Amino acid sequence: RSSDLFNVNPMAGVIFWTHGDHIHIMDEIELPNADTEYMMSHVRDEYKVTLDGVEYSRVEDVYPDASGNSRSTTAPGGKSDFYYIRQAGCHVFAKGANPLIRDRENAVNGLLNHGRLTISPKCKKLKSYLLKYNHESKHKPDQKAMSHLIDATGYPVHYLFPVNRPATVLATVGH
């Protein structure tokens, strides 16, 4: 799975897997001056597996910025960014509009605080950014540069584990 593909410089994404109520980010991507078509080509090349002589992508689902459904002036041919994700054989998971930044931040922080979001040591930038990022200073240049990978983390976390998700009863005891 991957996410956030519509910032141009850099275009950022995270590669992750989920298991139950846990999400693990295994890689981070920042590509300067990239478009969605190039990002998807990069993802397909970097995260493929060959079985019985047939290549498969290990990335099947993408949780992008919701604005990618509109036609893009940066996308070749005026096609939407979602078009290029689907052309790469991936499913797009995005709601009609992006969740509020605070909601994404709360979803990420909630999972981190409960040990349900883990990040590979390989993701040095993301780990550093999460420690340094400050919502109140988000428009300062150093904070803005960090926001791309943070957004790439926030979109899938909020989509899959929103802070307002109803609680699930895992077991009933004593009845």
Regions inferred by a protein language model and the residue ranges of each:
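Structural motif
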Residues: 142-148
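Mg2+-dependent endonuclease catalytic cores in nucleic-acid-processing enzymes, primarily RNase H-like
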Residues: 14, 19-142, 163-164, 169-175
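A short catalytic or substrate-binding loop motif that flags glycine-/basic-rich loops and adjacent residues
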Residues: 5-8
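Short, hydrophobic alpha-helical segments
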Residues: 156-164
